[in-house]
Amino acid sequence: MQAAKPLYDYPKYWAECFGPAPFLPMSREEMDLLGWDSCDIIIVTGDAYVDHPSFGMAIIGRLLEAQGFRVGIIAQPNWQSKDDFMKLGEPNLFFGVAAGNMDSMINRYTADKKIRSDDAYTPGGLAGSRPDRASLVYSQRCKEAYKHVPIVLGGIEASLRRIAHYDYWQDKVRHSILIDASADILLFGNAERAVVEVAQRLSNGEKIETITDVRGTAFVRRDTPQGWYEIDSTRIDRPGRVDKIINPYVNTQDTQACAIEQAKGDQEDPNEAKVVQILDSPAVTREKSVIRLPSFEKVRNDPVLYAHANRVLHLETNPGNARALVQKHGEVDVWFNPPPIPMSTEEMDYVFGMPYARVPHPAYGKERIPAYEMIRFSVNIMRGCFGGCTFCSITEHEGRIIQNRSHESILHEIEEMRDKVPGFTGVVSDLGGPTANMYRIACKSPEIEKYCRKPSCVFPGICENLNTDHSSLIELYRKARALPGVKKILIASGLRYDLAVESPEYVKELVTHHVGGYLKIAPEHTERGPLDKMMKPGIGTYDRFKRMFEKFSKEAGKEQYLIPYFIAAHPGTTDEDMMNLALWLKGNGFRADQVQAFYPSPMASATAMYHSGKNPLRKVTYKSEGVEIVKSDEQRRLHKAFLRYHDPKGWPMLREALQRMGRADLIGPGKHQLIPLHQPQTDTYQSARRKNSTPAGSHKVGKDQKILTQHTGLPPRGSDGSKPWDKREKAKAEAFARNQQAAKERKEASKGGKGNKKPRQPVIPR
C-alpha cells in the first residue's frame, strides 16, 4: 500500500511556542489567559466539549495543537444567529465544522421518526441543543459570520452524506452535503491525515480551492482535469445491436443470388468486416482513473441507479486500490479522492498520546454529560472493522483495515486514567473499539490486502487469508490486569463471536476474567434471508459460541449470561422470518424489553436496499434480484411485536397476522405456541424503561431472560426523563434487587417468631 507522510513529520507552525493548553479555549477570556490574540483554527461542533480521545473535536483539536496551531472550540452554539460563531473572533486559517460524534438526525430522532427525549452528548442529557442537519446550519452560519474564511467540513455526518444520499426523514435523495452546506472542502473517514495536510498547506499560503490532491477529501470542480482517464458508470443494462440469426438451411455461398446483396448495390455495409488497425493505448493507471457515477438528478429519480451508485462506492473503499469518484450535481461535479491511508501503530500512539485532560471542559461545572459517563473509564485500543455489516456505518467511516495501538500506549493510558480521572475505582469499563476482538487481526499478506475488493473479511465465511490469531489481545488483557491499582478489566464492546470461536483460548480468557455477569453479542436474526442481507453469520455460529461461553463460565465457577441483540424490519425480512425469530426467542427463554427497528442511515448498503428494493451486494440491473422491504408503519409495528411476543399489547396484531399467515396453530396456551388465545383483563407487562418496573437483576437469568435489542451504545433511558444509568448505577440496581429478595426471604423465615422487625430497606438508585 502507498506510504503516507507520518503525522509527526510535518514542520511545526510558529505558534508552537505557546505550548499545549490545559483545555482548548471556548471563550475570549481563556484565549487571553493563554496569551493568544486570535485562533488559527476554530472547531465548531454539535457536542459538548469533552477533552477525551473518544470525542472527535478533542482528537482533531489536540492533533492540530501538536502541529503548532492555536485551536479554539465553539461547542453547541446557538444557531439562531451568527453571534456565537463570532465569539472567538475570526480564525486565521479555517473553520472546522462537524455535527458531532453522531449524525444529528439519528441523534434527535428514533427509527420511527419520533423526537428523542434526551441527548447523551449534551450537559444534563438535555435534547434540543443542536439543529437538524447541524453540519449544514453551522457551515451557513460560519459563512454568514466571516464570508471569506474557508470552511472544512468533517465528522461522521458529513462523511456519510458526501455523495447523493437517501434521506430517511424526508424520504428522498438529497444532494451531497458539500453542495447544500456551501463548504469549501469535505474530509471523510478518520480525518487526521487530511486535516493536518490541509492546515499545513493553508498555513503556507495555498488557497483552499487549489487543494485537490489530498486523499480522503471531497470538493466541487467544474470538469475532469487533463491527464485523468474517466470510466463511465452512469448506466446499467446497456442495450447492444442484436444480429438476426441466419437460417441454417439457406445457402449463403451464392452471393449474386442474394436479393439483399443485389438491393445494396455499391453502398458500403456498416456490418461488413473490415481490417482494424490496432493502436497503442495510452498507459492508464488506477491513480489517474476516475469513475463517473450516475448524476444526482438520475439517482434521485431512479432507485435502481441509486443502488448501482451505492455498489460502486462501496467497491472503491480499499485505500490500496480505490479509484477517485465523481458525481454531477447540476452544473458542477463533486469529486471524491480515494480514502485515506490507514494510520500506523506509531501514528495511532501519537494521536492517543496527546495531553488530553480526559474530563469535560470546566465551563460545564458539575453538569453530567451522559456519553462521557459511559466512556470515562474506557480505553480505545483500535479503529476500523472488517465485518462489513450492511446496516452499520463503522466500516464506511473508519475503513476495513484495523489500525492498532501498541501495548505500551494502551497501558500508559490506563495508568493516566488511574492517576488523573476523578472517581476511578480500579475498574476499566471497556478495553475495545468498534468491535472487542479485532485487535491485531489482519490479512496474512499485505499484497493480497492491497488488491482485495471484498466487502467483508468474515462473510459468507471467514476469509482463508485472514489471520485470526488473538494472542496479542490475550497478552494485552493479561498486562492490563497486572497493572497496580487495576482491579477489573471489563469488555463492553460488541464481540464478533464468529472470530472468537476460532480462538478457544481467547474465549476462555474473556469469560474467566473480563465479563461482568453479562456479555453482549449481536446475532441480529436467526433466519438466513435477513442475515444474508446484513452480511452476518448464521445462528449456528451463535450456538457454537454459546456452548463455549457456558463451558468456560462453568469452569471458572461463574454464573454469566449472553445478551443477544436483534433487529426488526431489516431489508430482506419477511413476516415468516420474524415469526420464526419469535419462536426461537420463546424457545430459548428470551424476552426483549427494548426493540431496535432497522434505521436507514445515510450511505449504508442496507439503506440502498430499503430505498431501491435491489441488492447492491451483487451486480445491480433492472432485472436483478429484488429485496423484501418493510416500509409501512403497520408492518414495522408487526415485526417489533414479534420481537416482543410476550407483551399483551401486541397480541391482537399478532393473532391477526398469524391467522393471515395460516399459522393459527401458534395461538393458544401451549408451551410451543407463541401467544395466548385471549387477551388478559389488564396489560400487566411492564417495560424495563418504566420507573415502576423491576430493576435489572431482580429475577434469576436463565428462565425468561430479559434482553435488550437496542444497541445504540448508550445506556437505557428512564421514561420519566431521568438520565441514563452508567455501569455503577446499574450495579447499584442489581444490588438493590438482591437485597430486596434477601429481605423478602428473611421476612418469610421469621413469620410466626417473635421480634418480627421490618428489615431496613436499601436506598433505591435513581
Swiss-Prot record:
Residues 371-649 form the Radical SAM core domain. Gene3D superfamilies: tm_1862 like domain. Residues 723-735 have a biased composition (Basic and acidic residues). [4Fe-4S] cluster binds at C385, C389, C392. Keywords: 4Fe-4S, Iron, Iron-sulfur, Metal-binding, S-adenosyl-L-methionine. Its cofactor is [4Fe-4S] cluster. Belongs to the UPF0313 family. This is UPF0313 protein PP_4872.
